[in-house]
Swiss-Prot record:
Glycans are attached at residue 34. Residues 189-533 are cytoplasmic. It comes from Oryza sativa subsp. japonica. Residues 84-145 form the PA domain. This is Receptor homology region, transmembrane domain- and RING domain-containing protein 1.
Amino acid sequence: MNRRRTMLLLICLCATFCLMTQLGAANVVLMGTNLTLSFDDVEASFAPGVKGSGFEGVVYTAEPLDACSPLTSKAEKGPPSPFALIIRGGCTFDEKVKNAQDAGFKAAIVYDNENSGVLISMAGSSGGIHIYAVFISKASGEVLKKFSGHTDVEVWILPAFENSAWSIMAISFISLLAMSAVLATCFFVRRHHIRRDRPRIPEAREFHGMSSQLVKAMPSLIFTKVQEDNCTSSMCAICLEDYNVGEKLRVLPCRHKFHAACVDLWLTTWRTFCPVCKRDASTGIPDPPASETTPLLSSAVRLPSQSSSFRSSVAASPPRPISRRPSSQSISRIYAASGTPNSPNPIRSFTNSTAMSISRSNVDLSNMSSRPRASHLASAHSLVGSHLSPPINIRYASPHMSHSGYASPSPHVSSSYVSNSGYGSSSYYLGSSSQHRSYLRRCGESGPSLSTMAPQSPQQSQLRHGGESDLNLAGASSGQSFRQSYLRHCADSEVNLAGASSGQSFRQSYLRHCADSDASLSAMASAQSLPGC
């Protein structure tokens, strides 16, 4: 419809322009019976212009034809008005018109003597000229000459629009307006065609939806019957259709169900939230299984975060000491086996007893800080009557020294090798077997005293005593069998405990024992350069 209106407007503008141009050029019109001819003319600049609706008359040929001399033919008076037809040349235009005016003619029509096709504006003196004068082409003059003297054929000289200033301005304005309208119409038509023929470019959305892999990772089910009572249990909220048996439904993390095709299209092309509750559907979706198209960067980025979280959890958890409290039956069984003369493997029994002693020493040290002094004294009396309780030397043996003592003969017998046990005490390997025996006996006698007589700093005493027990084990493994050392140590410990409990107080026995130990250690230090107990 728009295109048709545009074409109609163009046709009307062209017709108007042509009509105005035709009216401006048709100044001389020949009208007869069944005959109408129009000719272009240009009015003379020295003659008055045609006014009103025009001027009517009958054309007559001038004699002489060039009208350079007074005319011999006289114009007839009365209507219609006579017009003189004159050829160009021979004299000036104003002379020709002057001679025609003097002969009684009301208008002078001058035609060209050559077929140049160019109409000129006749110039000359306007003094004394009162009739109309126009200039036409040679062809137009030849046609008018044929109808000369015919009173039944009228000739009209019409006013030319281009001859007035207002007419020129109006024609110029109308022409400019017509050209602008044509150009604007062409521009809009061209623009309309470009918009219609150009392919539609989809507008860029602010949100691009979820990937198809994440959508397919959501759980789905086959509809059988309505099992829940909610807005999406029987009807899809997207297409508003009821579920049919056998249709595939997609379950979002918010537990709302939809047709798989409907919700997949919604999540991948429009939004990532549930159409019903507006909850984000991308939360709570597990990662899809790895495939050939899975990018390697995701796994590489995920591993450091997992390892860092593991380290942080390990660092945040406090260290927990692991200590096992063996039952009394197992302790009795172990020491009974180690004290039997027919024991087939003394090394294995020593291993079991040492391991058990280490665990018990851990328990004793952890409980020592909370025990009062009276509890230490009570434990001393219980140790006197117990024949199967493990010796103090073995109870506080360090794990490092026990492994080097019973597994194999120590490779560091001839050197002073220092090792730090778990409790911060230092143990030493001695060079000679005689010094081993004296030093071990002294340390063995000090065992019960350290465990029963509570000094002012019980924990430091027990830690130092652990180092002495390590020396006992090392000396026993290198000088004599573990069985003999163990039996003699038990006997010495019981004698010391009995004497201390019957003769004097525990504190005095402990002080005397420390003095004896310091004296023997100082003598040994001068011989072997060993540190004190």
